[in-house]
């Protein structure tokens, strides 16, 4: 076995364990904020692919505020962009906790600081673009699913997506946009890899219209959402369902809780698996390595697993402001690779150019693709994203 990771330590081969991941639906207040920030980013990139955007959003009852630093040639109609994003989520009436037509929008956007901008100047060539900030970023992949993504979070995301679809197509018309899910899976250890055996617990909370009873809601969610989303082979007589454990959930969205951009970074990534460097994604253009390097970290980890170099992989990258090349590259394969860490890092260096200005070209990150990443996770669920398409590695 490899010298990196845990070398198949005894406890990695014995017994089972439970692991849990949570997700939130597009109408969750923090997710509204993420989507509004990314809608503004997309509006900038649609007109000016070199826009520099750092846009935060805060929301509470009847109010949404966008604030941050944006340098762009785009002519932005903030009222239109923000209200359309809220409308698309489904908040079109104050009885649902928010209304895109009547909410108060505050805009506090300034140009990017010249001190930060000078660290990023486009030299003459995009390749020489320095990182927009210091920081550490992680990517993770696992062979437990065809998507090479943790099954706990995949199911949690899919449950929220199913509720959104049922609300939009009218099959569950009493559903409202604010939903939360949590899935616990029993796994077995397999020489450092993890193998899902069964779903142990499913938690679903869904904002709803006042006319449906809790009893009816629980029945409908179980039959029309959970059992149509999670394959029957994972559900057994011991599976526990906590559907609407609080009882009523009529008041939701920003009326129920305040929302902020960047508050759902574990939902956005790997659901507690792997590791996280702390940087959020939404509202940031590709020069912010918090986002672009996390995407390339996923691309690297997924490519390593897809190539059969490991069954599980965690990759860390680090950057400094104004410096193009990463300061460090780390990889841990949890004992599932027959290559050493040094060999794997060399394979990464030989196959990936990790300068932000090259990442943007290879992954096509100057396009207005970001609003869709802010719904149901940036990884695993949407295989059309460029970073979800493994690179053919030479080694």
From Swiss-Prot:
Gene Ontology biological-process annotations: methionine metabolic process; one-carbon metabolic process; S-adenosylmethionine biosynthetic process
InterPro entries: ADOMET_SYNTHASE_CS, S-AdoMet_synt_C, S-AdoMet_synt_central, S-AdoMet_synt_N, S-AdoMet_synthetase, S-AdoMet_synthetase_sfam
Enzyme class, spelled out: transferase
Family: Belongs to the AdoMet synthase family.
Binding site for K(+): 56
Binding site for Mg(2+): 22
Catalytically driven reaction(s): L-methionine + ATP + H2O = S-adenosyl-L-methionine + phosphate + diphosphate
Domain of life, per lineage: Eukaryota
Binding site for ATP: 28, 178-180, 246-249, 257, 263-264, 280, 284, 288
Pfam families: S-AdoMet_synt_C, S-AdoMet_synt_M, S-AdoMet_synt_N
Record: residues binding L-methionine: 69, 112, 257, 288
Pathway named in the protein's UniProt entry: Amino-acid biosynthesis; S-adenosyl-L-methionine biosynthesis; S-adenosyl-L-methionine from L-methionine: step 1/1
Taxonomic lineage from the root: Eukaryota, Fungi, Dikarya, Ascomycota, Pezizomycotina
Name of this chain's protein: S-adenosylmethionine synthase
Keywords: ATP-binding, Magnesium, Metal-binding, Nucleotide-binding, One-carbon metabolism, Potassium, Transferase
């Amino acid at each position: 076995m490899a010298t990196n990771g845990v070398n198949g330590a005894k406890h990695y081969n014995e017994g089972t364990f439970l692991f849990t991941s949570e997700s939130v639906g597009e109408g969750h207040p923090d997710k509204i904020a993420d989507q509004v920030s990314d809608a503004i980013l997309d509006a900038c990139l649609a007109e000016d692919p070199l826009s520099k955007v750092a846009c935060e959003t805060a929301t509470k009852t009847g109010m949404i505020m966008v604030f941050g630093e944006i340098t762009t040639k785009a002519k932005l109609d903030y009222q239109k962009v923000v209200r359309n994003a809220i409308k698309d989520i489904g908040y079109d009436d104050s009885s649902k906790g928010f209304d895109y037509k009547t909410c108060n929008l505050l805009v506090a956007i300034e140009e990017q600081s010249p001190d930060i901008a000078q660290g990023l100047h486009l030299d003459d060539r995009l390749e020489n673009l320095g990182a927009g900030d210091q920081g550490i970023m992680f990517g993770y992949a696992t062979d437990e699913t065809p998507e090479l993504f943790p099954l706990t979070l995949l199911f949690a995301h899919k449950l929220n997506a199913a509720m959104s679809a049922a609300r939009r197509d009218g099959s569950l018309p009493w559903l409202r946009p604010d939903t939360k899910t949590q899935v616990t899976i029993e796994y077995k250890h397999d020489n450092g890899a993890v193998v899902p055996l069964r779903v142990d617990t499913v938690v679903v909370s869904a904002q709803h219209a006042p006319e449906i009873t809790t009893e009816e809601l629980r029945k409908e969610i179980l039959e029309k959402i959970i059992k149509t989303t999670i394959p029957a082979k994972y559900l057994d007589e011991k599976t526990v369902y906590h559907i609407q454990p609080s009882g009523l959930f009529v008041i939701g969205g920003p009326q129920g809780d305040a929302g902020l951009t960047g508050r759902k970074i574990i939902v956005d990534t790997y659901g507690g698996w792997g590791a996280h460097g702390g940087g959020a994604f939404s509202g940031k253009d590709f020069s912010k390595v918090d986002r672009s390097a996390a995407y390339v970290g996923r691309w690297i980890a997924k490519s390593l697993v897809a190539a059969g170099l490991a069954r599980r992989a965690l990759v860390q990258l680090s950057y400094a402001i104004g410096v193009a090349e990463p300061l460090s590259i780390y990889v841990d394969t949890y004992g599932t690779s027959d290559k050493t860490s040094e060999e794997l890092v060399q394979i990464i260096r030989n196959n990936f150019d990790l300068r932000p200005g090259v990442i943007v070209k290879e992954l096509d990150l100057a396009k207005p693709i970001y609003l869709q990443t802010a719904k149901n996770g940036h990884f695993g669920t949407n295989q059309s994203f460029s970073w979800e398409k493994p690179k053919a590695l030479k080694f």
